């Protein structure tokens, strides 16, 4: 689950030292590896017990003890396969698409930023579908909203992309109001 976050950090912060192409390939490879592992877990090739896996204690204050935990059940296994498999295909498609992208001037470094956003979106979606408590679900929900805004507005030089990103942000913000009632 934390693999795409690692890929996002590598693509976002290390592309200057390791190169843009290496960063994008690493981010893509991490998501593909996650998809392969999710298929093994889904098909019960790797034995994973149902329940919750506590990653770390998050908030401890008096009688309040909130843990960052990953829920493991049949639904989560299915959603891990869906999210990681689709994200792998999107990453692979983006590798080819970005190779011939004419929306930027030659020499501009932008591909690593896109893959950082895309990997962060994958991570936020994984947090959302595997959350064990409402606080963690909220962070996944908000992460998906932020990542959507960043991805939709990626071509920030185009006014249409900026308008679409703002519309998406407003729509997602409106739907956030309904989260506590569901």
Task: Describe the function of each predicted region.
Residues 1-3, 78-83, 137-144:
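Structural signature of hydrophobic alpha-helical transmembrane segments
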């Amino acid at each position: 689950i934390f693999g795409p976050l690692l890929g996002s950090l590598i693509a976002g912060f290390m592309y200057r030292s390791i190169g843009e192409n290496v960063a994008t390939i690493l981010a893509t490879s991490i998501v593909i590896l996650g998809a392969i592992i999710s298929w093994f877990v889904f098909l019960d090739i790797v034995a994973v017990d149902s329940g919750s896996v506590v990653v770390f204690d998050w908030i401890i204050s008096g009688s309040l003890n909130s843990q960052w935990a990953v829920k493991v059940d049949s639904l989560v296994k299915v959603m891990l396969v869906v999210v990681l498999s689709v994200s792998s295909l999107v990453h692979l498609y983006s590798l080819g698409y970005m190779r011939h992208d004419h929306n930027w001037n030659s020499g501009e470094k932008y591909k690593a930023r896109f893959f950082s956003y895309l990997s962060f979106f994958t991570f936020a979606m994984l947090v959302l579908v595997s959350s064990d408590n409402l606080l963690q679900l909220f962070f996944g929900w908000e992460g998906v909203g932020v990542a959507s805004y960043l991805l939709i507005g990626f071509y920030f030089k185009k006014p249409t992309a900026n308008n679409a990103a703002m519309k998406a942000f407003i729509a997602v913000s409106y739907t956030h109001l309904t989260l506590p009632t569901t």
